[in-house]
């Protein structure tokens, strides 16, 4: 059974989904490149994330979901454990982190995921995993969920930017 092939021959849907993932780190970087440290740390309310923490969460999600994807490809219906995103953001102290390093890590994990998806045979997008909180889903459903999640957080970054800058 062939698991991988080049992007050539991919369905339009797969290519579009992969492209949406590929461009996210650049889009996030462009949104925040002109912001001051004070603006990057702006919190709209108590207990809410600042821009740096949202980007840190995206970095964490990219790392964890890359691992989940590899497990779904290499194992039969693996269990994919959840994680406490709030605790991880606090533990990694993204508010104090070097944003360039966080963005670079996000881009690196995303590049790895895009490479794997680019090479994955379309038929294998049906392979499944079992998330302990969400339940069973295919690689296609998993990646589509990832795209929606990242689009939501890109809008979150834009909203925080508007609040922090007044524009």
Q: Where do the model's predicted regions map?
A:
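Extreme N-terminal tail/first-helix region
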Residues: 1-23
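Short, contiguous alpha-helical
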Residues: 2-7, 41-85, 111-114, 128-167
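General structural signal for secondary-structure boundaries
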Residues: 10-16, 36, 84, 98, ...
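Acidic/His metal-coordination segments adjacent to aromatic residues that form catalytic metal sites
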Residues: 11-13, 51, 88-102, 133-141
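Short gly/ser-rich anion-binding loops that grip negatively charged ligand groups
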Residues: 18, 55, 59, 103
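A structural signal for long alpha-helical coiled-coils and helix-turn connectors
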Residues: 36, 73, 118-121, 161
């Amino acid at each position: 059974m062939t698991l991988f092939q080049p992007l050539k021959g991919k369905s339009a849907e797969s290519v579009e989904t992969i492209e949406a993932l590929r461009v996210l780190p650049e889009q996030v970087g462009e949104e925040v490149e002109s912001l001051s440290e004070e603006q990057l740390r702006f919190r709209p309310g108590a207990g809410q994330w600042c821009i740096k923490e949202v980007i840190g969460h995206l970095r964490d999600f990219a790392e964890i979901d890359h691992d989940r994807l590899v497990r779904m490809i290499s194992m039969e219906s693996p269990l994919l454990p959840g994680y406490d995103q709030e605790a991880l953001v606090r533990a990694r102290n993204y508010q104090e982190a070097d944003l360039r390093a966080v963005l670079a890590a996000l881009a690196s994990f995303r590049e790895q995921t895009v490479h794997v998806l680019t090479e994955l045979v379309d038929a294998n997008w049906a392979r499944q995993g079992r998330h302990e909180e969400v339940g069973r889903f295919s690689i296609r459903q998993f990646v589509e969920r990832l795209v929606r999640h990242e689009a939501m957080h890109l809008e979150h970054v834009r909203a925080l930017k508007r609040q922090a800058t007044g524009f």
